[in-house]
């Protein structure tokens, strides 16, 4: 298993997802091996290990407004930095809900700050409230935050 150091996603295409993922490596050759593994499992991959533009700037710009993010609600979560924390979140989600935005960057702390955009049908509001309460991770809804409205909200 490899430590995920960064994970950025914004819905932009109904047919395919473009995800910016950072993985911990100790040797440059490991990046090529990881890339081959992704390709072997059917994932199109662009290796950005040596791409300074990606590492210094574009990693912070993944996303923007998306016409596919209608009825999106935005949340900040605090996840424990331990194996299984994200899987617990994903397993608890209803299959009819959609993650339209996801941003995580490992800061070296014992917890991770996650930003998630979720598309949840209005008919599921009660189930969604239960999901948030039983998940047990601290969260803040940011759907009405001015910076969200300026740069991300469709």
Model regions and ranges:
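A conserved regulatory-domain signal marking ACT and ACT-like small-molecule sensing domains
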Residues: 1-154
């Amino acid at each position: 298993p490899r430590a995920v150091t960064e994970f950025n996603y914004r819905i932009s295409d109904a047919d395919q997802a473009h995800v910016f993922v950072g993985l911990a490596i100790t040797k440059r050759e490991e990046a090529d091996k990881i890339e081959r593994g992704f390709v072997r499992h059917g994932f199109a991959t662009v290796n950005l290990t040596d791409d300074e533009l990606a590492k210094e700037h574009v990693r912070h710009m993944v996303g923007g407004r998306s016409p596919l993010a209608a009825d999106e609600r935005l949340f900040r979560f605090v996840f424990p930095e331990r194996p299984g924390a994200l899987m617990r979140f994903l397993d608890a989600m209803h299959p009819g809900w959609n993650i339209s935005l996801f941003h995580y960057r490992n800061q070296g702390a014992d917890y991770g700050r996650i930003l998630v955009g979720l598309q949840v049908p209005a008919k599921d509001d009660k189930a969604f409230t239960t999901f948030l309460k039983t998940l047990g991770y601290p969260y803040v809804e940011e759907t009405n935050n001015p910076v969200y409205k300026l740069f991300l909200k469709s």
